[in-house]
Amino acid sequence: IVLHGRAWGELYVARQAGQPVFDRADADFATVLAAVVASGIAQTERLEEVRKLAFTDPLTGLANRRAVDVRLDEAMERHRVDATVVSLVVCDLNGLKAVNDTHGHAVGDRLLERFGSVLSLCGAMLPEALAARLGGDEFCLLTAGPPADAVVGVATELCDRAAVIELGDGVACGVASTGDPIGPVRSARRLFRLADAAQYRAKAARAPGPVVAGRDGEVVRLADSPPKSAHDRRRLRGNRP
């Protein structure tokens, strides 16, 4: 079986003892069959590559926003069915603009890649966590199952590691979890708004660790309040369906 000009595998055919030996027509049929198998494998690989491109951030190799939306909707459905704890950590990498302005966008991209690696390593501490880049300097970590305290612990570790990344200026990190006292969370949009509000508060306070919705009394109020202006960054995910 030849795939992309290289030997991918072998196809064997056999007959029971006493049956006629294979002739040229049989060999030709086997060749055609191998080509059909190779075509099917190639198509499957192409579809997998398209799927990967559709759900992967090309710079960091992490999941992208589309993947987060799909996984978060699935997680919230589990939460509605059996009260699975769903947690969202939203991060804003500090200092990226200064790095881009001072050292160039290539260096800024390397900073994003380094933080993406740190996020992936921290995400591996939680079962089936999804590490993603939402776009620009924003990242997130999504979990379904681990308790809120475990997620906050990993978010704290993430902040500690981000603080020592070369050329970086730490990370503003907000956490929202259905395992914390944040009121009913019936939609992915609500959880995103709470996590975004927590991250917004962490950014404003330059908090060294994560700000957690339900543990910081201002976060829920901030999530529920209207934007103060058209340029308020809390509008970023406010219109998410």
Swiss-Prot record:
Residues 215-241 are annotated as: Disordered. One of its GO terms (biological process) is cell adhesion involved in single-species biofilm formation. GO terms for molecular function: diguanylate cyclase activity. Disulfide bonds: none annotated. Residues 84-216 form the GGDEF domain. GO terms for cellular component: plasma membrane. It comes from the Bacteria. Residues 231-241 have a biased composition (Basic residues). This is Uncharacterized protein in hutH 5'region. It comes from Streptomyces griseus.
